[in-house]
Amino acid sequence: MEQLRGKIMKIRKICLLSLLITLIFGVVSCSDNKYGEYGYRIEEDLTTTNIIDDNYGNFYEIFVRSFYDSDGDGIGDLKGVTKKLDYISELGFTGIWLMPINKSSSYHKYNVDDYYAIDYQYGTMADFEELIAECHKRGIKIIIDLVLNHSGSNNPLFNKAVNARIKYQAGLELSEADEKFKDFYTFFDSSSDIPKGVTAYKAPNASFYYEANFDSSMPELNYDSPYVYEEVRNIMKFYLDKGVDGFRLDAVKYFYYNYHSKNVEVLSKINQMAKEINPKAYIVGECWDSDAVISQYYKSGIDSFFNFPGSVTNPNGYILNGINREGDALNTYYEGMLKNITLAGEYVPAPFIDNHDTVRFTSTRNYRNSKFQYALLSMLNGNTFTYYGDEVGMVGTKEVDQNVRIPILWGEESGDCSLISGVTSHELTRYIYPTVSEQIADEDSFYNFYKKCLLIRNQNPEIARGNIELVTMDRDTDKLLFISKEYNGNKIGIVFNFSPYYDLTIDIKQYGYEEVIGQIVVDNSEKYIGELKDGKIKMPSYSIAIVKWG
């Protein structure tokens, strides 16, 4: 009996020991389910955002003609934009910039024939008012392209000006309207009066010339005339009263051809008039020039100017050339980050990579590089601008403008727009990429990568607004850049692995940071940023970690 009891006790001990071992290793096994090649997989918050109502956001540039066709005529329209506002919002954009929507004789509509009318191809004023209302319901700001340095040659303003000038030259009696319009545009009495570098054309049925630096259909307004300012104020008031949140000003160097100080005076007056109507109106200007010139234009008080030196237009731009370079990639990008801020001074930087006038940046790099470049853009201070279609990897060379204004492929039963006339046959062979619908379903797509970049940006207000300090930089391996950004008493760290091939391990705690709170990884479905058992973090190639300050 004692022997049996002893055997039972022995069996019990073995069972208990076995159970204990099972429990211990079971727990370890469970906890290690999240432990892989890159350490512990961090649980991320993929829903919460912290969006502030200011001018530091993420804008989405839309060429309406090629965006979404709501009525089946092959031409994108305002109702199509309204239909896709949820798509834009879900991506993480906080504002939209509409390329010109006014009545025009061209496909691009930069020659405006009526500043107070919507082009019939795009819809009606009621459609536009609905779009504004629906934007604001979703917390999306809307700015429109305002072309104020020139109008269209079919604009009644130009016709009135030419007729008044003809009467003036003939010595005929001028009406009050004639007096107003005879100097409304920049006219030259003879070809010898045309300044060097300025392009001018003979006015219709007249002996004099008019300035038109872009095309004969785009006569330049004369900002020596007070009546031009009156008209500009009326135009801005018309749209601000309808609820637009501001304007993108086209070609601001051409109010007075390359006369920068005079252009700054014009912009200062335009800005003052807009702010008198709506103090919160946001204005961004197109000054396609160097850092030195753009810095002069900020003296106008305009909120933002596009940072062309950092874009694809600059062969040495810090976003494109901040990767895949030997020895200086980190410094190139870091210095660019700082210059982006100092250039704007007290105003709002407006970094971008490409737009409707440039090659699409995805045409210049491979798939992984292009994704990482957008991640670099999303880490910059200011108000970023993204060109429609970039979020699905659309390509486009600059043989002709039409090549970079091709329709998005939605992958739906309707909505795709027809091609614009003039797209080159070479470009059509490259017009093959997964549709929007396909990319939404693909974890590793451009679409989902852009969405993640914008989510991280929207979760951390410090990214767009914070003061930058360098934590550490490893120039020897050309991999590690670690910076901090502090805003409103809160500080985060941003750790970059610039290597396209190699992992990076770093002890963030030695710099005072606690944990990873967000991550961007180019190869998202295969790799992640993880915490190792020794407290360090391991980052795969082409990745960015947002880390919490201790």
Residue ranges and their predicted role:
Residues 35-44, 150, 158-176, 234-235, ...:
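Active-site-proximal helices and loops of the catalytic beta/alpha 8
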Residues 1-8:
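Short, Lys/Arg-enriched N-terminal segments with co-localized hydrophobic residues
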Residues 14-31:
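Sec-dependent N-terminal signal peptides of Gram-positive bacterial secreted proteins and lipoproteins
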Residues 509-525:
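Solvent-exposed beta-hairpin/edge-strand motifs
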Residues 364-505, 512, 539:
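Loop/helix patches that line or flank the sugar-binding groove of alpha-linked glycan CAZymes
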Residues 530-550:
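C-terminal beta-strand-rich structural cap/linker in extracellular carbohydrate-active enzymes
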Residues 84, 127, 131, 228-239, ...:
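Alpha-helical packing segments of well-folded alpha/beta enzyme cores
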Residues 30-217, 221-222, 227, 241, ...:
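Acidic/aromatic-lined carbohydrate-recognition and catalytic surfaces
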